[in-house]
Amino acid sequence: MFAAPLGFLRASALSFLCFFVLVALPASAPAQVTYDQILHSADSPSNWLQYAGTYDGHRYSSLSQINRDNVSQLAAQWIFQTPQPGSFENTPLVVNGIMYVTAPEDLAFALDAHTGRKLWAYKRALPEKLRACCGHTNRGFAILGTRLFLATLDAHVVALDSATGNVLWDVQAADYAQGYAFTVAPLVVKDKVIVGVSGGEYGIRGFIDAYDVATGKRVWRFYTIPAPGEPGSDTWSSPEAAARGGAPAWVTGTYDPGLNLLYWPTGNPSPSDDGSGRKGDNLYSNSILALNPDTGKLQWYFQFTPFDLHDWDATEVPVLLDTELDGKPRKLLLHANRNGFFYVLDRTNGKFLFAKPFAKQTWAKGIDVSGKPILLDTPQPGETEGVPTCPGAAGATNWMPPSYSPQTGLLYVTAREQCDVFYTHPQHFVEGRLFLGSMYVPSTKVKDWGAVRAIDPKTGDIRWEYKEFSATWAGNLSTAGHLVFTGDLEGNFIALDADTGKPLWHIQTGSAIYAPPITFELDGRQYVSISSGALLLTFALPAPAR
């Protein structure tokens, strides 16, 4: 079915914003988070221990106290307000009753998850002239033992004491003045913390790093653009183009412990929309990289958009799924890409299995049997003659995480229906300055809109769609209560029926939502949290009468 868009909310929906916590319960003591707990995160749904909840990227919780029969009774329990406005894209961690939160400008907090009471705060002294593109955001922590790991806008990786917020170690990964930055939530694998760099709009050379969790010593670095003479270097027209070729890695990857493979997505080549100086496929931009997490060695890669001219990063969370396909058990990697196609790969070797459009696209006839796009014969953008293209530069989806429910067998994707008119604007590279080579403006012929789409990963078919007024930036969460939680640019926090897409509940938060929700359990009660504006809001069903 296709659900209707959410209508205007009555003023009473805002009443919860006047709710304040008057009595703060004592928080639980910080506890050791073992690697075994992280490996088996799905077995401990009371906590939220890593960016996607589990290594496979499912963002699914087996908690079901909140379900489609009672979700209409959800009510705000507490609200925490950060002092820093901006794009609040954080995924909180919850460990034994303590919530760990990051906010714009690399602020960080520990909160009592019962009440929202602040336990400690960390504020980084950032340089005045940061080069970070697209908002001074941060997407969250990783944790192991009593160490929290934070990747910062000035291109450092930091370990904090989870009990106090004190700095345990701080290492510089790159020079922020050259355009390097971190916005990614780190990922812990074994005894390493793994991060991918931002800065594709500044002509950086992208990389993925692994650091020793105890000391901060860098263990390995994988450059996402090959050095001269390395495999893939011939996909760049010159060493100079490759040296400033971008391919950042700014979204958290996923991990298969059985195969011991780390799957990390990469972003656009640089300059993002002018290919005149970088002819070729531009490896390993717009790709999924399968790396050995012990060594950083590349095991295989798959590139979605060779020679990208539209800023279509592949920095969307790769989702791992074990299922039958065409009558055979397969280990799959699912990827709804910014270019408008949904891809299914064999994650053991990177073999392309199939792809289908999941949003409007006007640049390709389809994808061939090898996984390469079959391009339409369209004119190239000029400095004065623009070319309308769908999707636009922000993509048919973007960094906002999808979720997968084993209950329904569906992948839930935030889709964006937005087209842009692209122009070229050639420019010379200057270190530390924006290096785009183009400009683009929204198409005036079609209004943008958004949707949550439920995709069958075995066929690529869209089972249902929930339409939203604007092209949204919220991720989603699915639960065993037959629910999908999401948000929209109009500030609505929404619960949908996971089987049908029917809207079951919503509340107006007062600000646009740019984050994915999480869920956790305390003292037998299930909670759901979402970031909105400068607020972190937490909801639950009414407490049982005593």
Residues of each region from the PLM?
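Loop/turn-rich, solvent-exposed surfaces of beta-rich toroidal or solenoidal domains
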Residues: 444-498, 502
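Beta-propeller blade signature
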Residues: 206-217, 281-296, 349, 450-456
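Blade/loop signatures of beta-propeller domains
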Residues: 33-76, 224-231, 441-442, 448-450
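N-terminal cofactor/phosphate-binding cores enriched in small/glycine residues
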Residues: 61-173, 479
